[in-house]
Amino acid sequence: MSLETTVLTFKLSNTFEEWVKMFDSSEIDAFHKTVGLTPLYRGKSLIDPKKVIVIHQAEEGLAKHVFSDPDTIKNIESGGHIYSTTKITSWVSD
C-alpha cells in the first residue's frame, strides 16, 4: 500500500479555537496514533473562520475508512465538526 494524503474541509458548529482545543488534545492524539493517522496541518479559512481544513497522511484508504465509521462520526461531531459539510479528497505521489 502507498502513503495517501487526505484533505478534509468542513464547517464548525463552534469556534475554531474551541475545536482546536479538542483536536490538539491528548485523547485525539492517542486516537490518531491508534488508528494510524498522521495529522500534517489544520487551519481555518481567512474568509470564513468556521470553515476548517485538516490534512492527514496514512496508508491508502485508511482515512476514508476511519472517517466513515459511525462511532468516529459521533465523536468528531461532539467536538464541533459538522460532518454533513465534510468534503474529503485523497492524493498520492505515485
What feature does the model see in each segment?
Residues M1-I73, I82-D94:
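Short S/T/G/P-rich N-terminal loop/turn motif that feeds into the first structured element of a domain
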Residues E77-G79:
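Short, exposed beta-strand-loop hairpins at the edges of beta-sheets
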